[in-house]
Amino acid sequence: MSQSFRVLLVEDDDSLRCCLGEFLAAQGWEVGATAFATEALTMARQQRYDFSLLDFHLPGMTGLELFQQLVSLRPLPAILMSGLANAEEAAAAQHAGFFTFLRKPLDLARLRQSIQLLIQSHFGGPLIPLRLHQQHCLPPLPPKPPFPPTRPNR
């Protein structure tokens, strides 16, 4: 039986929040999900969470700002996700203390691996297998462009 965790999920895209919430709940974990940073802060004051998944671009504040306020309440390992972030924002996430930074569209295998490593790093014990119950809810990554055909040297 896997260990039970409480996860705070803050994602303003309704469909992605729903899919991620289903994936996390399929692990047997309790999920607190919201689209709003201010609501996430209220939830964190009322409930103790073990780790969080935060979107970078949220209404009212960034995921970085939210993370700083969350850890001022209590230490909380977090994964930051963004589809628009650049290298500077990824570096800022690392400097702020996020466990890792994931680019959207999310690769479910990478998300699973990141969560497994976060759990192992912060809570000890062996890597736990995560169920793939809802893997179909995340859109597939776009195909990589083919290499251009090589031309023979003339």
What is each PLM-predicted segment?
Residues 65, 85-100:
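Alpha4 helix (beta4-alpha4-beta5 surface) of REC/receiver domains from two-component response regulators
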Residues 88, 106-115:
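C-terminal output helix
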Residues 14-32:
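Two-component/phosphorelay signaling modules centered on CheY-like receiver
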Residues 64-76:
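Short amphipathic alpha-helix used as the core "switch/output" element in two-component signaling
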Residues 36, 62-65:
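Acidic catalytic/metal-coordinating carboxylates
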Residues 11:
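Conserved acidic carboxylate
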Residues 33-51:
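Acidic, metal-coordinating helix/loop segments flanking the phosphotransfer/catalytic sites
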